[in-house]
Amino acid sequence: MSGGLDVLQMKEEDVLKFLAAGTHLGGTNLDFQMEQYIYKRKSDGIYIINLKRTWEKLLLAARAIVAIENPADVSVISSRNTGQRAVLKFAAATGATPIAGRFTPGTFTNQIQAAFREPRLLVVTDPRADHQPLTEASYVNIPTIALCNTDSPLRYVDIAIPCNNKGAHSVGLMWWMLAREVLRMRGTISREHPWEVMPDLYFYRDPEEIEKEEQAAAEKAVTKEEFQTEWTAPAPEFTAPPQPEVADWSEGVQVPSVPIQQFPTEDWSAQPATEDWSAAPTAQATEWVGTATEWS
């Protein structure tokens, strides 16, 4: 679908992304309708997908999506975990309607249902896993686009994009490529500058792995703080008292004289005696003796 235009040709960095994500690696089984997209077969039985055909079909799918006036009329579906995050990111970037997770039967055919929808275009991640929306789309004449592996059935699929739809990196990269081409054809982003959104945002991540990474990062931060507090704590600043300057060391240092504070003194002999210490105890003794004789 590039039409021989250099602008629409696949770039070298795109090929490197495809190879790094394993998009060209198919399965060991081959559907007879997918033979036209196969380049060769490896010695271990894995079929290699022709990436040139993948790019051409990617451009065709992007043109079909851009042809829909209302972006919300495009439904993107992924029932498998590896494509759910990519579907949500694609919908956020292009304005499509995502259905991540289990597809409720009757969404396209049962008008009584609360989740009833009438999309104009359907994009699925795996024709085998998403067979229910494909079947319902055939009932109501909805054109369909699908990411197809070498063993995927092409029944009810109008535009098949040959790629590896099993790997998490491959699925995320294909949705990222499709979103980028849609935005380029709409004129939202330029082809001269790379898209600032990274393909990593479209990759599926296992929740258990995320928890393990967060725990490891937290433990690493705690140990780093302990190490810094033990070994890299700033030492208290010590300031030495100023030393007196001595020009001649033989003379010695003169110690400054401190004046002695004078306190007023009193003459204890001049004060008169206030009490007679010998008279008072005898009076008390006679009283206590009298009481003692009464008890006896």
UniProtKB/Swiss-Prot annotation:
Its main location: membrane. One of its GO terms (biological process) is translation. Monomer (37LRP) and homodimer (67LR). Component of the small ribosomal subunit. Mature ribosomes consist of a small (40S) and a large (60S) subunit. The 40S subunit contains about 33 different proteins and 1 molecule of RNA (18S). The 60S subunit contains about 49 different proteins and 3 molecules of RNA (28S, 5.8S and 5S). Interacts with RPS21. Interacts with several laminins including at least LAMB1. Interacts with MDK. The lineage of its organism: Eukaryota, Metazoa, Chordata, Craniata, Vertebrata. Belongs to the universal ribosomal protein uS2 family. Residues 267-296 are annotated as: Disordered. It comes from Taeniopygia guttata (Zebra finch). The record marks 115-116, 133-134 as: Cleavage. [DE]-W-[ST] repeats lie at residues 230-232, 248-250, 267-269, 276-278, 294-296. Gene3D superfamilies: Glucose-6-phosphate isomerase like protein, domain 1 (3.40.50.10490). Required for the assembly and/or stability of the 40S ribosomal subunit. Required for the processing of the 20S rRNA-precursor to mature 18S rRNA in a late step of the maturation of 40S ribosomal subunits. Also functions as a cell surface receptor for laminin. Plays a role in cell adhesion to the basement membrane and in the consequent activation of signaling transduction pathways. May play a role in cell fate determination and tissue morphogenesis. It comes from the Eukaryota. This is Small ribosomal subunit protein uS2. This protein appears to have acquired a second function as a laminin receptor specifically in the vertebrate lineage. The modification N-acetylserine is found at residue 2.
